[in-house]
């Protein structure tokens, strides 16, 4: 038989069950045949007492057929149980709808506080292991590293190679200027010395008398 969740094909109708049997008991009883999705025991609207009828929804059709064949005409706590594939009365969608029990402070089976239906003292088959809680996928906010904006600086460093080259050029230029300065200074000194010698050198004046004797003048 093909699988797939189809309430009209994978729901078992169980009747003549003990009135004291709870939803948890039916779940535990039918779980041996396959994955049980939901158990609903029909209760009186006013007294909330069981009417001895239950619907068990399985995950697949094969499990439902196995359960119906095994439980049909079986003695259960002194009562002859009847089981068959449930006939769809058009309310399958309503039946499959999951109920959310927001109040977790009290048991929905007996209404008492301090325990849940899985561990209710009224369960004839004892406690049932609660289904694993579905972990809610929390959207983790990926904390992106803060982008540190670089501070604007007016004093930007130059390339070391360019810096050393400029220093060499400047040094060479300074040497050239220094040499040129020295040359100019030496030329000026030489010019001044020559002028000074010419000034102090005695000049020979010819005698007015055209004599062979020369007169020295300062």
From Swiss-Prot:
The keyword Zinc-finger applies. Residues 146-161 have a biased composition (Acidic residues). A zinc finger (CCHC-type) spans 105-122. Residues 161-196 form a coiled coil. It holds the Pfam family zf-CCHC. Keywords: Coiled coil, Metal-binding, mRNA processing, mRNA splicing, Nucleus, RNA-binding, Spliceosome, Zinc, Zinc-finger. GO terms for molecular function: RNA binding; zinc ion binding. Residues 122-218 are annotated as: Disordered. Residues 10-88 form the RRM domain. It comes from the Eukaryota. One of its GO terms (biological process) is mRNA splicing, via spliceosome. It is found in: Nucleus. Residues 175-187 have a biased composition (Basic and acidic residues). Its main location: nucleus. One of its GO terms (cellular component) is U12-type spliceosomal complex. InterPro entries: Nucleotide-bd_a/b_plait_sf, RBD_domain_sf, RRM_dom, ZCRB1, ZCRB1_RRM, Znf_CCHC, Znf_CCHC_sf. Component of the U11/U12 snRNPs that are part of the U12-type spliceosome. This is Zinc finger CCHC-type and RNA-binding motif-containing protein 1. It comes from Danio rerio (Zebrafish).
